[in-house]
């Protein structure tokens, strides 16, 4: 199926990026543990309460693993390549979710008493090889920052998680 083929590309690219940038399993696991700890802390403080709609069977992110340790993650099998570095803890989980964002003109938001959460000051896209597609956001982000006359130091928050830790670390 096409979804299976797409999934295989994701899997391969995670290993390819790790290999290209010499990112070890330990480094990916450290990133995953830190990601889970930060997410658990934010969830415990209620920081996600306005972002997650309770649908009865689910009221919070069930993929946060606050008990993750290097020892526990060391026990996981390699996920995709028996000579690789990526495990279930450092790749994208099988999960369901949905998201919606309203993007509108500033005047429309003001006229309709909508809270303005952000301004889009620049956009960009970046083509890249399929076997390292996880690197695409790097070039796109650099180009968008340049167009906006900003640097990464001007950005307050960058959200990255453990899903394919190799690309986040690259």
Q: Where are the language model's segments positioned?
A:
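Single conserved hydrophobic/aromatic residue that forms the stacking wall/gate
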Residues: 1-6, 10
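Active-site pocket-shaping loop/turn-to-helix segments
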Residues: 7-8, 19-33, 86-100, 121-147, ...
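Structural signal for hydrophobic packing residues in well-ordered secondary-structure cores
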Residues: 14, 18-21, 25, 32-47, ...
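Conserved small-residue
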Residues: 14, 28, 73, 96, ...
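N-terminal extracellular/periplasmic Venus flytrap/periplasmic-binding protein-like
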Residues: 27-111
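Structural alpha/beta core scaffold segments of enzyme domains
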Residues: 109-110, 146-152
């Amino acid at each position: 199926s096409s979804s299976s083929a797409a999934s295989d590309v994701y899997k391969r690219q995670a290993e390819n990026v790790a290999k290209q940038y010499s990112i070890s399993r330990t480094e990916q696991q450290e990133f995953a543990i830190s990601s889970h700890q930060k997410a658990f802390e934010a969830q415990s403080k209620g920081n996600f309460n306005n972002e997650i709609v309770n649908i009865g069977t689910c009221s919070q992110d069930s993929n946060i693993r606050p008990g993750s340790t290097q020892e526990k993650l060391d026990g996981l099998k390699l996920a995709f390549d028996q000579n690789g570095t990526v495990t279930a803890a450092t790749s994208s989980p099988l999960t369901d979710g949905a998201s919606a964002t309203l993007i509108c003109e500033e005047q429309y938001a003001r006229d309709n008493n909508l809270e303005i959460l952000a301004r889009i000051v620049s956009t960009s896209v970046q083509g890249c090889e399929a076997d390292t597609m996880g690197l695409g956001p790097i070039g796109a982000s650099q180009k968008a920052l340049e167009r906006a006359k900003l640097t990464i130091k001007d950005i307050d928050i960058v959200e990255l998680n453990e899903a394919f830790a190799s690309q986040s670390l690259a």
